[in-house]
């Protein structure tokens, strides 16, 4: 695919990561590391493709409880917390039960569309009001 993008001197790759890359968050170290790897890869790729008129972009969605993302695990995230961390984790899970801002599916779709159609060299597209707030704070 990259060979064709170089030959046409056009094209865009949009990778979707997470707002965990915008600010350190507790209880998400491994998940954050996996998303940061994609961010680093995409940032480097953007430089490489840019020399050929193609682009790479990142969409960073916020917390989306309506996506049922955690249901894909097949078990409760709270049940995965080791006992020594239970007291530390409790208020974090309580805060996630009633977040002040969330990301909806439409927020992500809009950010992907914007990233795919933006001819600039902008790399980051936070998706959802919570992700936008984190990006501005960072």
Model feature map: region roles:
Residues 51-122:
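SDR active-site lid
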Residues 123-134:
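Short-chain dehydrogenase/reductase
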């Amino acid at each position: 695919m990259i060979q064709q993008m170089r030959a046409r001197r056009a094209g865009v790759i949009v990778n979707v990561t997470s707002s965990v890359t915008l600010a350190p968050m507790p209880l998400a170290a491994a998940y954050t590391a996996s998303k940061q790897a994609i961010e680093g890869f995409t940032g480097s790729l953007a430089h490489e493709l840019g020399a050929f008129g193609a682009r790479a972009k990142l969409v960073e969605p916020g917390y989306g409880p309506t996506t049922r993302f955690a249901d894909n695990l097949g078990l409760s995230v709270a049940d995965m917390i080791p006992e020594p961390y239970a007291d530390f984790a409790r208020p974090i899970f309580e805060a996630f039960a009633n977040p002040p801002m969330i990301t909806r599916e439409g927020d992500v779709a809009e950010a992907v569309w914007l990233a795919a159609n933006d001819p600039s060299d902008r790399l980051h597209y936070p998706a959802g009001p919570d992700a936008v707030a984190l990006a501005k704070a960072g």
